[in-house]
Regions:
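Conserved NTP-donor binding/palm subdomain of two-metal-ion nucleotidyltransferases/polymerases, i.e.
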Residues: 1-126, 132-369
């Protein structure tokens, strides 16, 4: 696909930021005030605002955006750096608390993955995903440890949502936490069962330092992250896949390559891995040779930058129009997601019916941007 000016600018900034190199400035010459504004807004939307800022700081003065935009950008970056430090402290404190109770805690994605980046505090994230298990199998099982982790929060007066078979949800010191029982939606996708069993074998937790050694946490192996990130991105295809996910993949590939266990043979999933890698090679400065995925890569990028259907801010009014829009969106998202993670259409429809029966107010609700 052909990139517009602001998209070209953003990719140039990200490539320089991720690989600590000079910015390719061809697309930045004669960039207007509006081009820079659109570049900044796109970076914010795609969850790469702080990463793009590192690229801006590599530019000569005459190619940088206006002082007003730089001030806005710098303030947003500073705010995120403070958020990142708070997340690092929180996950380290939570891990230490659990450790005293005989529970080991592995950080999934998030601040653990940020250590793959040249500037970890500029890798943006949302909630904290953890996997809790027994630190000593002679004293309690992994399942007992995972259950105890939730019970300990309840004892502190923290409300824990345990409705999901995949993970529980709670807020710890104001930060959303997902405590995983399983890594993937094994009850939903057939391929998830196979990948889940592999993930359990290759997790190999290792100690990882955060904030220049101020905190220590456990993180999974590169092989684990290869499969986990690919599956996570695949789930978001059609419903929120962003450059944020692509940058994670680029950093993984740059640091460790792609580690795919030989027992993983699902054609759709392997094509998704190829497509993600193809996009990183084209736009984010990686050079990992992998066959296939070109066509899917094109479709992925189109969906990332110009999604056909919005998840928020639906531009229609009236119950009939909203229902038609959401139905078309559901069918479209199901079709493209099925290219990577197969799920029978009857099951997707049934899941949607169950959700809306439980929460009928969501049928005609228009989510805000």
């Amino acid at each position: 696909m052909t990139l517009c000016k602001s998209e070209q600018m953003l990719f140039a900034l990200l490539k320089a930021s991720l690989h600590q190199q000079e910015v390719e400035t061809e697309c930045l010459h004669q960039a207007s005030v509006d081009d820079w504004k659109q570049c900044y807004l796109l970076a914010c939307k795609q969850g790469v605002m702080a990463l793009a800022w590192d690229g801006v700081m590599k530019l000569p003065q005459e190619l940088q955006p206006s002082k007003g935009l730089k001030l806005t950008w710098a303030m947003a970056v500073e705010a995120y750096e403070k958020k990142y430090a708070r997340y690092c402290q929180t996950v380290a404190e939570l891990s230490e608390f659990y450790q005293k109770q005989g529970i080991a805690t592995v950080q999934l994605k998030g601040v653990g993955l940020s250590t793959y980046y040249p500037n970890p505090s500029h890798r943006e994230g949302g909630d904290i995903d953890i996997f809790t298990f027994s630190a000593d199998k002679n004293k309690m099982s992994d399942g007992e440890a995972n259950k105890l982790a939730d019970e300990l929060m309840v004892k502190q007066g923290i409300e824990v949502d345990m409705h999901s078979p995949k993970h529980s949800n709670f807020f710890y010191k104001g930060i959303p936490i997902e405590n995983h029982k399983t890594f993937l939606n094994v009850e939903r996708f057939p391929i998830a069962v196979q990948v889940e069993s592999i993930l359990k074998k290759v997790i190999n937790p290792q100690h990882t330092a955060l904030l220049n050694g101020e905190y220590q946490i456990l993180t999974p192996s590169a092989c684990f992250n290869t499969l986990f990130l690919a599956f996570h991105s695949a789930q978001h295809y059609g419903s929120g896949l962003a450059l944020h996910h692509l940058c994670d993949w680029a950093m993984l590939v740059s640091k460790y390559g792609i580690q795919i266990p030989k027992e993983l043979t699902d054609r759709r999933f392997l094509e998704a891995i190829s497509a993600l890698t193809c996009l990183c090679n084209r736009y984010l400065g990686t050079s990992y040779v992998i066959p296939g995925g070109e066509l899917l890569a094109d479709e992925m990028l189109e969906e990332i930058l110009h999604p056909k259907y919005l998840q928020r801010g639906i531009a229609v009014k009236g119950k009939i129009n909203i229902f038609v829009y959401k139905t078309k969106r559901f069918l479209y998202m199901s079709r493209i997601n099925n290219r990577i993670l197969y799920l029978p259409m009857w099951k997707r429809v049934w899941e949607s019916i169950v959700i809306h029966v439980r929460k009928p107010d969501t049928i005609f609700r228009v989510e805000q941007k």
